[in-house]
A protein has these predicted regions:
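N-terminal intrinsically disordered, cationic/polar leader segments
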Residues: 1-159
């Protein structure tokens, strides 16, 4: 199947990676048209959800320190739209250099943004990278410096 850019946003286009948070990157794709072609109408004859896992979620805390975690995003099948995958990745990457604060503030932002984009109430669970319950990850030997108290204002090579 060939998708048109107008119908599916940035899919298939060369894209610049965002340097700051932007919820407008989320590109919804309406479920109704595909369901109508399949003869599926409301009420839906099934239940379900789309589950997205973000294994490399990162953002900055209020002091500018990088934070990392894993996220599970659940979008109900009853939502008006799904989110186009490339736009979802760009949205997640837009968080990387943005001062957000703690993981709860990030979770609230993501719930609001994704719920608005898909037209349904989503759930987001964020797990710290150091406590990946439910995400089978093997840890390497070494010293974790993620919790070191420092203020960071410059993110480039040494001057």
């Amino acid at each position: 199947m060939v998708f048109k850019v107008a119908e599916h946003g940035i899919l298939g286009q060369h894209t610049q990676y965002p340097s700051q948070y932007d919820s407008r990157l989320l590109f919804p794709i309406a479920r109704a048209e595909a369901r109508e072609r399949l003869g599926i109408f409301s009420p839906l004859p099934f239940i379900g959800q789309d589950i997205w896992n973000a294994y490399e979620l990162s953002w900055l805390d209020k002091a500018g320190r990088p934070r990392a975690g894993l996220a599970e995003i659940v979008i109900p099948a009853t939502s008006e739209s799904i989110i186009e995958s490339k736009s979802f990745k760009l949205y997640l990457n837009s968080l990387n250099q943005t001062r957000i604060g703690d993981s709860e503030r990030l979770r609230q932002m993501m719930v609001s943004d994704i719920s608005q984009a898909c037209g349904g109430k989503v759930t987001v669970a964020i797990t710290p990278a150091t406590a990946s319950h439910g995400f089978p990850i093997e840890y390497l030997n070494g010293e974790v410096i993620d919790e070191m108290e420092v203020d960071i204002n410059y993110y480039g090579p040494p001057e």
